[in-house]
Design a protein with these regions (language model features):
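Sequence context surrounding c-type heme c attachment/ligation sites in exported
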Residues: 7-22, 31-34, 50, 92-96, ...
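Periplasmic/extracellular electron-transfer cofactor-ligation site
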Residues: 15-38, 62-65, 111-116, 148
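Sec-exported extracytoplasmic/periplasmic mature domains
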Residues: 15, 46, 58-62, 74, ...
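C-terminal capping alpha-helices of c-type cytochrome domains
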Residues: 1-3, 73-134, 140
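The canonical Cys-X-X-Cys-His
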Residues: 10, 17-28, 53, 69, ...
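Gly/Gly-Pro-rich "capping" loops immediately C-terminal to redox-active cysteine motifs
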Residues: 22, 26-56, 68-82
Length: 153
């Protein structure tokens, strides 16, 4: 469970201008979702495993070459993954893994929290129901998160 400070930090990554997750991910808002190219993250908890989502966030191109999600959002630093873009001052002194922070946030994401982020980003409000809209041309290898041999995480 994330602390209130960690939730705020994760929210700032999730909605950053350097990597605005909801720019591409469906939100349940029909107007937004008709152009969305990625699944609604409210569906992650019921369909995916956290370790797989973390691997996807770190290197989506390695899992599905050609996907529109970039693989350079995080970089390895001192045995942890850190956001490659600018981070707010609240991240000073935070020595934990940024990808894990974001994954934990995604797996705790609620419709209310998603609406809060959408509103803060100046978008129309998302519905309370997750949209099932997912690009069908992207094959997500091992979406249930079985770790590959040699995976140290």
């Amino acid at each position: 469970m994330l602390t209130a400070k960690e939730t705020d930090m994760a929210r700032s990554l999730f909605s950053s201008t350097a990597a605005p997750c909801l720019k591409c991910h469906a939100t349940g808002d029909p107007q937004h979702d008709k152009a969305a190219t990625a699944p609604n993250l409210l569906l992650a908890r019921g369909r995916l495993k956290p370790d797989w989502v973390e691997r996807w966030i770190i290197d989506p191109q390695g899992i599905s070459p050609g996907t529109s999600m970039p693989s350079d959002l995080f970089r390895r630093e001192n045995n942890r993954w850190v956001f490659a873009g600018p981070t707010p001052p609240s991240f000073q002194g935070y020595d934990k893994d940024h990808t894990r922070l974001l994954v934990d946030y995604i797996f705790q994401l609620t419709p209310e929290e998603q609406r809060r982020v959408v509103a803060a980003m100046g978008r129309t409000q998302a519905s309370t129901q997750p949209s099932g809209s997912v690009r069908q041309d992207v094959s997500l290898s091992d979406p249930h998160g079985a770790a590959s041999a040699g995976d140290s995480r």
